[in-house]
UniProtKB/Swiss-Prot annotation:
Catalytic activity, EC: 1.2.1.72
Keywords annotated in UniProt: Cytoplasm, NAD, Oxidoreductase, Pyridoxine biosynthesis
Pfam families: Gp_dh_C, Gp_dh_N
SUPFAM superfamilies: Glyceraldehyde-3-phosphate dehydrogenase-like, C-terminal domain, NAD(P)-binding Rossmann-fold domains
Site (Activates thiol group during catalysis): 181
Species: Aeromonas salmonicida (strain A449)
Function: Catalyzes the NAD-dependent conversion of D-erythrose 4-phosphate to 4-phosphoerythronate.
Major subcellular location class: cytoplasm
Gene Ontology cellular-component terms listed: cytoplasm
Residues that, per the record, bind substrate: 153-155, 199, 212-213, 235
UniProt record, GO biological process: pyridoxal phosphate biosynthetic process; pyridoxine biosynthetic process
Protein name in UniProt: D-erythrose-4-phosphate dehydrogenase
UniProt-annotated catalytic positions: 154
Sequence positions that bind NAD(+): 11-12, 317
Gene behind the chain: epd
């Protein structure tokens, strides 16, 4: 039995809990605790009702200082300092740190010092962590000695399996990526102050360029592409699901059919459950609650002069990523 604690019960934290239960209930993983500064009543309410993902089909209620999900009692804490959390007493094997705030080795060591066996960040972390994992691409590098791991980002998990597949087939020279990301909590409902002047503007009224470290994150997973990719990102007025526009140049001459068939083979083979492929006339909302890291829209693949390839891919940046958090947790524990 893998005992996990969730630190930070926001979008990803809640989706991890729901994904664990809705996937058919992995009997080998049990959530024993959640640490969140919000009111317990709000935590219960937002577990039961979700604007993007609908009603949770399991009953959820407060039970003293715990949350009862079905018949499972989950201890609730509201502790600012992770060093004060009772991970040792609870026998926590892995802390899923979903705060989006912590990301350094020193941050993770607070959980370890409190008795947790391992820590998995739900976001890009500093370079001094033991490993950064994109499940399906490099989770095999886990040896069991890693105690502090990052699950990278939703966009890294979306694009890296595609890049790795196409490089293996056609040898990529370089590329650019545009992330078209749904709005996030760090944006404003109406115009308000923010250190990033673009983010002072109402999220529902504009397409808003934002900074991204996606290219650097990609290099950490695929170091042979250091300096070969650049990325930009915009936020759009939707609340979930992200599109990614990938352009690459390849050494081998290719056609649209070559590219699409390579991705279809990967989706049926080594990347089954991670990569999906469609040629249906779908829009972003159709990928809501999709557990894949990436879904290729084969109708949008383009090839120019046999070497320049452009394609469109989708991901549910919440649900898909939450499922990868659970996959990486299993891989960390299976490694030892």
């Amino acid at each position: 039995m893998i005992k996990i604690a969730i630190n930070g019960y926001g979008r990803i934290g809640r989706n991890v809990l729901r994904a664990l239960y809705e996937s058919g209930r992995d009997k080998n993983i049990k959530i024993v605790a959640i640490n969140e500064l919000a009111a317990p009543e709000a935590m219960v309410h937002l577990t039961r009702f979700d604007t993007s993902h609908g009603r949770f089909r399991y009953p959820v209620q407060l039970a003293g200082h715990s949350m009862l999900v079905g018949e499972d009692l989950i201890s609730l804490f509201a502790e600012q300092d992770p060093a004060n959390l009772p991970w040792r007493a609870l026998g926590v094997d892995v802390v899923l740190d979903c705060t989006g705030v912590f990301g350094s080795r020193a941050d993770a060591e607070l959980h370890l010092g409190a008795g947790a066996g391992k820590v998995l960040f739900s976001h890009p972390a500093d370079a001094d962590v033991d490993a950064t994992i994109v499940y399906g691409v490099n989770h095999q590098v886990l040896t069991g000695r890693e105690r502090i791991v990052s699950n990278a980002s939703c966009t890294t998990n979306c694009v890296v399996p595609v890049i790795e597949t196409l490089h293996r087939e056609f040898e990529i020279n370089c590329g650019t990526i545009t992330t078209i990301h749904s709005a996030m909590h760090d944006q404003q409902v109406i115009d308000a102050y923010h250190s990033d002047l673009r983010r002072t503007r109402a999220a529902s009224q504009s397409i808003i360029p934002v900074d991204t470290k996606l290219a650097k994150g990609l290099e950490r997973i695929l170091p042979h592409f250091a300096g070969k990719f650049e990325a930009i990102a915009v936020r759009v007025p939707t609340i979930n699901v992200t599109a990614m526009d990938l352009s690459i140049t390849v050494r081998k001459k290719v056609t649209v059919t070559d590219v699409n068939q390579a991705l279809q083979r990967a989706s049926r083979g080594t990347l089954s459950g991670i990569l999906d492929y469609t040629e249906e006339p779908l829009v972003s909302v159709d990928f809501n609650h999709d557990a894949h890291s990436c879904i290729i829209d084969g109708t949008q693949t383009r090839v120019s002069d046999a070497n320049l390839v452009k394609m469109l891919m989708w991901c549910d940046n919440e649900w898909g990523f939450a499922n990868r958090m659970l996959d990486t947790t299993r891989a960390m524990m299976a490694a030892g």
